[in-house]
Design a protein with these regions (language model features):
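PLP-dependent amino-acid enzyme catalytic core
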Residues: 1-344
Length: 344
Protein backbone atom coordinates (compact mmCIF):
# COMPACT_ATOMS: atom_id res chain seq x y z
CA UNK A 1 0.00 0.00 0.00
CA UNK A 2 1.38 3.42 -0.93
CA UNK A 3 1.29 6.44 1.34
CA UNK A 4 -1.28 8.06 -0.94
CA UNK A 5 -3.58 5.02 -0.66
CA UNK A 6 -3.21 4.70 3.08
CA UNK A 7 -5.19 7.78 4.04
CA UNK A 8 -6.99 10.52 2.18
CA UNK A 9 -6.67 11.45 -1.48
CA UNK A 10 -4.45 14.23 -2.77
CA UNK A 11 -7.53 16.43 -3.18
CA UNK A 12 -8.40 16.07 0.50
CA UNK A 13 -4.82 16.91 1.46
CA UNK A 14 -4.92 20.04 -0.69
CA UNK A 15 -8.17 21.14 0.94
CA UNK A 16 -6.71 20.73 4.43
CA UNK A 17 -3.93 23.28 3.84
CA UNK A 18 -3.30 25.46 0.80
CA UNK A 19 -0.45 27.45 -0.69
CA UNK A 20 -2.58 30.55 -0.03
CA UNK A 21 -2.50 29.72 3.69
CA UNK A 22 1.29 29.49 3.59
CA UNK A 23 1.70 32.68 1.56
CA UNK A 24 -0.55 34.51 4.01
CA UNK A 25 1.55 33.21 6.90
CA UNK A 26 4.73 34.36 5.15
CA UNK A 27 3.36 37.88 4.77
CA UNK A 28 2.17 37.88 8.37
CA UNK A 29 5.48 36.83 9.97
CA UNK A 30 7.79 38.68 7.59
CA UNK A 31 10.37 40.75 9.45
CA UNK A 32 9.75 38.98 12.76
CA UNK A 33 11.58 35.76 11.88
CA UNK A 34 14.87 35.28 10.06
CA UNK A 35 14.81 34.52 6.35
CA UNK A 36 17.51 31.93 6.81
CA UNK A 37 20.14 31.21 4.15
CA UNK A 38 19.98 28.27 1.75
CA UNK A 39 23.50 27.23 0.85
CA UNK A 40 25.09 24.65 -1.42
CA UNK A 41 27.54 22.32 0.33
CA UNK A 42 30.24 21.26 -2.11
CA UNK A 43 31.92 18.90 0.35
CA UNK A 44 28.75 17.19 1.58
CA UNK A 45 27.64 16.85 -2.04
CA UNK A 46 30.86 15.02 -2.86
CA UNK A 47 30.43 12.73 0.14
CA UNK A 48 26.76 11.97 -0.55
CA UNK A 49 26.91 11.62 -4.34
CA UNK A 50 24.17 14.20 -4.87
CA UNK A 51 23.90 17.99 -4.85
CA UNK A 52 23.04 19.08 -1.32
CA UNK A 53 21.52 22.42 -0.39
CA UNK A 54 21.11 23.27 3.30
CA UNK A 55 18.39 25.47 4.81
CA UNK A 56 19.85 26.89 8.03
CA UNK A 57 16.81 27.11 10.32
CA UNK A 58 19.17 26.66 13.26
CA UNK A 59 19.98 30.36 12.75
CA UNK A 60 16.57 31.54 13.98
CA UNK A 61 16.62 33.52 17.24
CA UNK A 62 15.46 30.46 19.19
CA UNK A 63 17.65 28.23 16.97
CA UNK A 64 14.67 26.41 15.43
CA UNK A 65 11.98 26.77 12.77
CA UNK A 66 9.23 26.28 15.36
CA UNK A 67 8.85 29.99 16.00
CA UNK A 68 7.37 30.45 12.50
CA UNK A 69 4.26 28.43 13.24
CA UNK A 70 3.96 29.71 16.79
CA UNK A 71 4.06 33.31 15.59
CA UNK A 72 1.49 32.70 12.86
CA UNK A 73 -0.88 31.25 15.45
CA UNK A 74 -0.27 34.16 17.84
CA UNK A 75 -1.04 36.71 15.13
CA UNK A 76 -4.50 35.15 14.65
CA UNK A 77 -5.56 35.76 18.24
CA UNK A 78 -8.38 38.15 19.06
CA UNK A 79 -7.69 40.99 21.48
CA UNK A 80 -9.52 39.07 24.21
CA UNK A 81 -7.46 35.93 23.55
CA UNK A 82 -4.27 37.98 23.67
CA UNK A 83 -5.30 39.48 27.00
CA UNK A 84 -6.07 36.09 28.54
CA UNK A 85 -2.94 34.43 27.16
CA UNK A 86 -1.93 31.17 25.51
CA UNK A 87 -0.82 27.80 26.79
CA UNK A 88 1.10 24.85 25.35
CA UNK A 89 2.56 21.55 26.45
CA UNK A 90 6.14 21.28 25.27
CA UNK A 91 9.65 20.74 26.57
CA UNK A 92 11.28 21.59 23.27
CA UNK A 93 11.62 24.23 20.58
CA UNK A 94 7.89 25.02 20.41
CA UNK A 95 7.94 26.25 24.00
CA UNK A 96 10.77 28.68 23.28
CA UNK A 97 9.34 29.95 20.01
CA UNK A 98 5.90 30.52 21.52
CA UNK A 99 7.34 32.14 24.65
CA UNK A 100 9.66 34.44 22.72
CA UNK A 101 7.10 35.78 20.28
CA UNK A 102 4.26 35.79 22.80
CA UNK A 103 6.29 37.91 25.19
CA UNK A 104 7.39 40.19 22.34
CA UNK A 105 3.72 40.74 21.43
CA UNK A 106 2.59 41.22 25.03
CA UNK A 107 0.72 37.90 25.19
CA UNK A 108 1.13 35.91 28.44
CA UNK A 109 2.52 32.44 27.70
CA UNK A 110 2.19 29.41 29.97
CA UNK A 111 4.15 26.27 29.15
CA UNK A 112 3.40 22.97 30.90
CA UNK A 113 6.31 20.54 31.11
CA UNK A 114 6.73 17.18 32.86
CA UNK A 115 8.52 17.33 36.22
CA UNK A 116 11.27 15.24 34.66
CA UNK A 117 12.22 18.02 32.22
CA UNK A 118 15.92 18.98 32.48
CA UNK A 119 16.46 22.24 34.34
CA UNK A 120 18.26 23.76 31.35
CA UNK A 121 15.11 23.47 29.22
CA UNK A 122 13.01 25.13 31.90
CA UNK A 123 15.53 27.95 32.16
CA UNK A 124 15.70 28.41 28.38
CA UNK A 125 11.94 28.81 28.16
CA UNK A 126 11.78 31.17 31.12
CA UNK A 127 14.63 33.25 29.70
CA UNK A 128 12.49 34.21 26.69
CA UNK A 129 9.44 35.07 28.79
CA UNK A 130 7.45 31.87 29.24
CA UNK A 131 5.90 30.91 32.57
CA UNK A 132 6.68 27.25 33.17
CA UNK A 133 4.36 24.91 35.07
CA UNK A 134 5.80 21.49 35.96
CA UNK A 135 3.18 18.75 36.12
CA UNK A 136 3.23 14.97 35.79
CA UNK A 137 5.92 12.46 34.96
CA UNK A 138 5.34 12.16 31.22
CA UNK A 139 4.48 14.42 28.30
CA UNK A 140 0.96 12.95 28.25
CA UNK A 141 0.51 14.08 31.86
CA UNK A 142 1.74 17.57 30.99
CA UNK A 143 -0.50 17.73 27.93
CA UNK A 144 -3.59 16.72 29.92
CA UNK A 145 -2.83 19.37 32.55
CA UNK A 146 -2.35 22.03 29.87
CA UNK A 147 -5.77 21.25 28.40
CA UNK A 148 -7.26 21.42 31.90
CA UNK A 149 -5.70 24.85 32.53
CA UNK A 150 -6.92 25.96 29.10
CA UNK A 151 -10.50 25.40 30.26
CA UNK A 152 -10.08 26.67 33.82
CA UNK A 153 -8.33 29.92 32.89
CA UNK A 154 -9.86 30.62 29.50
CA UNK A 155 -6.51 30.35 27.73
CA UNK A 156 -5.92 29.53 24.07
CA UNK A 157 -4.08 26.27 23.45
CA UNK A 158 -1.40 26.40 20.74
CA UNK A 159 -0.58 22.90 19.53
CA UNK A 160 3.05 22.28 18.52
CA UNK A 161 2.09 20.65 15.20
CA UNK A 162 -1.53 19.50 14.77
CA UNK A 163 -2.92 22.92 13.87
CA UNK A 164 -3.46 24.42 10.38
CA UNK A 165 -2.14 27.83 11.47
CA UNK A 166 1.01 26.29 12.90
CA UNK A 167 1.54 24.09 9.83
CA UNK A 168 1.05 27.08 7.53
CA UNK A 169 3.72 28.96 9.44
CA UNK A 170 6.11 26.03 9.21
CA UNK A 171 5.39 25.83 5.49
CA UNK A 172 7.11 29.18 5.00
CA UNK A 173 10.38 27.25 5.31
CA UNK A 174 9.51 25.43 2.08
CA UNK A 175 8.34 28.62 0.40
CA UNK A 176 11.72 30.22 1.07
CA UNK A 177 13.63 27.11 -0.03
CA UNK A 178 11.98 27.05 -3.44
CA UNK A 179 12.36 30.81 -3.87
CA UNK A 180 16.06 30.54 -3.05
CA UNK A 181 16.73 27.36 -5.09
CA UNK A 182 13.81 26.77 -7.50
CA UNK A 183 15.19 23.75 -9.37
CA UNK A 184 15.46 21.17 -6.60
CA UNK A 185 14.54 17.56 -7.31
CA UNK A 186 13.84 16.51 -3.74
CA UNK A 187 13.13 17.95 -0.29
CA UNK A 188 14.12 15.84 2.72
CA UNK A 189 12.32 16.88 5.89
CA UNK A 190 12.39 15.58 9.50
CA UNK A 191 9.05 14.37 10.89
CA UNK A 192 7.98 14.47 14.51
CA UNK A 193 4.31 15.36 14.71
CA UNK A 194 4.30 16.35 11.05
CA UNK A 195 3.72 20.11 11.06
CA UNK A 196 6.89 21.05 9.18
CA UNK A 197 6.60 18.48 6.40
CA UNK A 198 2.86 19.16 6.00
CA UNK A 199 3.56 22.80 5.27
CA UNK A 200 6.54 22.10 3.02
CA UNK A 201 4.72 19.38 1.05
CA UNK A 202 1.81 21.76 0.49
CA UNK A 203 4.19 24.32 -0.98
CA UNK A 204 6.01 21.79 -3.17
CA UNK A 205 2.76 20.35 -4.54
CA UNK A 206 1.55 23.82 -5.51
CA UNK A 207 4.76 25.22 -6.99
CA UNK A 208 6.24 22.12 -8.64
CA UNK A 209 4.44 18.77 -8.26
CA UNK A 210 7.47 17.00 -9.75
CA UNK A 211 9.50 17.75 -6.62
CA UNK A 212 9.75 14.68 -4.41
CA UNK A 213 9.08 15.19 -0.70
CA UNK A 214 10.70 12.64 1.61
CA UNK A 215 10.19 12.51 5.36
CA UNK A 216 12.65 11.21 7.94
CA UNK A 217 12.05 9.72 11.37
CA UNK A 218 14.31 8.16 13.97
CA UNK A 219 14.14 4.35 14.02
CA UNK A 220 13.26 4.49 17.72
CA UNK A 221 10.22 6.74 17.07
CA UNK A 222 8.64 5.65 13.75
CA UNK A 223 5.17 6.89 14.69
CA UNK A 224 4.19 8.62 11.45
CA UNK A 225 5.91 5.93 9.35
CA UNK A 226 3.91 3.24 11.16
CA UNK A 227 0.63 5.11 10.82
CA UNK A 228 1.03 5.78 7.11
CA UNK A 229 2.27 2.26 6.35
CA UNK A 230 -0.42 0.68 8.51
CA UNK A 231 2.10 -1.11 10.70
CA UNK A 232 2.25 -1.74 14.44
CA UNK A 233 5.69 -0.52 15.54
CA UNK A 234 7.02 0.26 19.00
CA UNK A 235 8.01 3.84 19.81
CA UNK A 236 10.42 4.62 22.61
CA UNK A 237 14.00 4.79 23.73
CA UNK A 238 16.81 7.29 24.12
CA UNK A 239 17.28 8.98 20.74
CA UNK A 240 19.60 11.80 19.77
CA UNK A 241 16.72 13.18 17.70
CA UNK A 242 14.56 14.00 20.71
CA UNK A 243 13.04 16.93 18.83
CA UNK A 244 11.18 14.47 16.57
CA UNK A 245 10.60 11.78 19.21
CA UNK A 246 6.81 11.88 19.00
CA UNK A 247 4.77 8.82 19.95
CA UNK A 248 1.43 10.09 18.63
CA UNK A 249 1.57 12.02 15.34
CA UNK A 250 -1.04 14.60 14.45
CA UNK A 251 -4.41 13.71 12.91
CA UNK A 252 -4.51 16.79 10.70
CA UNK A 253 -0.88 16.38 9.66
CA UNK A 254 -1.33 12.66 8.96
CA UNK A 255 -3.96 13.43 6.33
CA UNK A 256 -1.68 15.88 4.53
CA UNK A 257 1.33 13.57 4.70
CA UNK A 258 -0.75 10.68 3.37
CA UNK A 259 -1.74 12.68 0.34
CA UNK A 260 1.38 14.68 -0.47
CA UNK A 261 4.52 13.02 0.91
CA UNK A 262 6.24 10.53 -1.40
CA UNK A 263 8.17 8.45 1.12
CA UNK A 264 9.30 8.23 4.74
CA UNK A 265 12.73 6.89 5.69
CA UNK A 266 13.98 5.74 9.08
CA UNK A 267 17.47 6.46 10.40
CA UNK A 268 19.44 4.92 13.26
CA UNK A 269 21.36 6.56 16.06
CA UNK A 270 24.82 6.10 14.53
CA UNK A 271 23.68 7.77 11.32
CA UNK A 272 22.27 10.70 13.30
CA UNK A 273 25.50 11.09 15.26
CA UNK A 274 27.60 10.99 12.10
CA UNK A 275 25.41 13.64 10.48
CA UNK A 276 25.65 15.97 13.49
CA UNK A 277 29.42 15.51 13.46
CA UNK A 278 29.75 16.12 9.71
CA UNK A 279 27.72 19.31 9.82
CA UNK A 280 29.91 20.67 12.60
CA UNK A 281 33.17 19.62 10.97
CA UNK A 282 32.35 20.59 7.38
CA UNK A 283 29.77 23.38 7.60
CA UNK A 284 30.88 24.67 11.02
CA UNK A 285 27.26 24.71 12.15
CA UNK A 286 25.70 23.18 15.27
CA UNK A 287 22.53 21.15 14.82
CA UNK A 288 20.53 18.97 17.17
CA UNK A 289 19.77 15.37 16.28
CA UNK A 290 16.47 16.23 14.60
CA UNK A 291 18.21 18.90 12.55
CA UNK A 292 20.67 16.33 11.21
CA UNK A 293 18.02 13.73 10.31
CA UNK A 294 17.77 14.79 6.67
CA UNK A 295 21.50 14.47 6.07
CA UNK A 296 21.53 11.16 7.95
CA UNK A 297 18.86 9.80 5.59
CA UNK A 298 20.70 10.93 2.46
CA UNK A 299 23.95 9.36 3.63
CA UNK A 300 22.16 6.18 4.75
CA UNK A 301 20.36 5.75 1.39
CA UNK A 302 22.90 6.89 -1.24
CA UNK A 303 21.24 5.12 -4.18
CA UNK A 304 17.91 6.77 -3.33
CA UNK A 305 19.32 10.27 -3.88
CA UNK A 306 22.21 9.69 -6.31
CA UNK A 307 22.67 12.56 -8.75
CA UNK A 308 19.67 14.55 -7.47
CA UNK A 309 19.51 18.16 -6.29
CA UNK A 310 18.42 17.72 -2.68
CA UNK A 311 17.22 20.36 -0.20
CA UNK A 312 17.70 19.57 3.49
CA UNK A 313 16.19 21.44 6.43
CA UNK A 314 18.53 21.94 9.39
CA UNK A 315 15.46 22.41 11.54
CA UNK A 316 17.09 23.12 14.90
CA UNK A 317 20.33 23.68 16.75
CA UNK A 318 19.39 23.25 20.40
CA UNK A 319 21.66 20.50 21.67
CA UNK A 320 23.23 20.17 25.10
CA UNK A 321 26.96 20.91 24.87
CA UNK A 322 27.93 17.86 26.91
CA UNK A 323 25.81 15.64 24.67
CA UNK A 324 27.40 17.23 21.61
CA UNK A 325 30.87 16.55 23.01
CA UNK A 326 30.00 12.88 23.55
CA UNK A 327 28.54 12.59 20.05
CA UNK A 328 31.74 13.97 18.54
CA UNK A 329 33.94 11.66 20.60
CA UNK A 330 31.92 8.57 19.65
CA UNK A 331 32.01 9.53 15.99
CA UNK A 332 35.78 10.06 16.10
CA UNK A 333 36.18 6.64 17.71
CA UNK A 334 34.06 5.00 14.98
CA UNK A 335 36.28 6.60 12.35
CA UNK A 336 39.44 5.37 14.07
CA UNK A 337 40.54 8.94 14.75
CA UNK A 338 40.47 8.58 18.52
CA UNK A 339 42.63 6.19 20.51
CA UNK A 340 43.04 5.52 24.20
CA UNK A 341 46.37 4.56 25.66
CA UNK A 342 46.64 2.78 28.97
CA UNK A 343 50.05 3.02 30.62
CA UNK A 344 50.80 0.59 33.40
Amino acid sequence: MTIQQAFASNDAARDALTIADVRAAAARIEGAVVRTPMMHSITLSQIAGCEIWLKFENLQFTAAYKERGALNALLHLSEEQKRRGVIAASAGNHSQGLSYHGTRLGVPVTIVMPRTTPTVKVMQTESVGGKVVLEGETFDDAYAHARQLEQERGLTFVHPFDDPLVAAGQGTVGLEMLEQVPDLDCLVVPIGGGGLISGIATVAEALDPAIEVVGVQAELFPSMYARIKGKDMACGGDTLAEGIAVKAPGEFTSRIIAGLVDDILLVGEKALESAVSLLLQIEKTVVEGAGAAGLAAVLDHPARFAGKRVGLVLCGGNIDTRLLANVLLRDLARQGRLARLRIT
